[in-house]
Amino acid sequence: MHAVVKWLYLLALIVWVGQVVFFSFVAAPALFRTLSTVEAGRAVGAIFPTYYRLAFACLTILLLGDVLFVVTGTSRAWWTASTCLAAAALAATLYAGIVVQPRATALRPQLHAPEAPPHVRAEFDRLHRLAVQLNGVALVCGLAISAMTAATLKP
């Protein structure tokens, strides 16, 4: 059973970090480079619910795996640190997906209206910056977890 848990842990880590990197550095920039801002925003908005659900699932698996490895494994200090990082990444992702993204989505229809007040653009920009920062925190946590996981692998 321990091999299955390790496999699920590694799969969740790979899928989650891969999706963050792909979306942040490939998909979103390509959409905004090739489509109008309105269409790119609509496309990204359509991706976000699945993006966050997948991240929540992967991070939950990581967190459960980390706790299991702390309790049953060696390298407890590494796994405790990994648990803290996974919890931080999950908190950042939950906040981005449950609080920030819905607020930004609610503002999107007003952004491109001719009579859109300036405070709408300012609030959307603030939410976007916050979402990018939270995503960055999650990515740094994921890269650190990847490095710690690699350090604990047995040849």
Model-predicted regions and their roles:
Residues 1-155:
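Polytopic transmembrane helical bundles with strong interfacial aromatic enrichment
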